[in-house]
Amino acid sequence: MTMTDPIADFLTRLRNANSAYHDEVTLPHSKLKANIAEILKREGYISDYRTEDARVGKSLVVQLKYGPSRERSIAGLRRVSKPGLRVYAKSTNLPRVLGGLGVAIISTSSGLLTDRQAARQGVGGEVLAYVW
């Protein structure tokens, strides 16, 4: 059966593994999910990710990051633009998450960017998710 919203599934698996203090989470691979994982790694929300060959297709293994006393690096994840209600933002009206403490992941014509990168490049796009 096909999945309606693979990005929401990706974020939900991360949220569930994070709240259960798992060290890593395995999920179906796609280039979009790998790009989101790259942004999360660059911003310091996850420690690493890798692609593995599974029996069918590929898998994306994301290693979660915790502080010295097991405090979570990811406090929250929220899907913004959904298949039933797409959310777009102009370059002049990009969202700020928690006053700049969090990050908005935006799909632009230049690829996936954070809100700060999109503002710097002067491009808008579809607001995929908020991470804080």
From Swiss-Prot:
Similarity comment: Belongs to the universal ribosomal protein uS8 family.
Gene Ontology MF term list: rRNA binding; structural constituent of ribosome
Descriptive protein name: Small ribosomal subunit protein uS8
Keywords: Ribonucleoprotein, Ribosomal protein, RNA-binding, rRNA-binding
UniProt GO BP: translation
Cross-referenced PROSITE patterns: RIBOSOMAL_S8 (PS00053)
GO cellular component, one term: ribosome
Coiled-coil stretches noted in the UniProt entry, renumbered to this chain: none
Organism name: Mycolicibacterium smegmatis (strain ATCC 700084 / mc(2)155)
Subunit structure of this chain's protein: Part of the 30S ribosomal subunit. Contacts proteins S5 and S12.
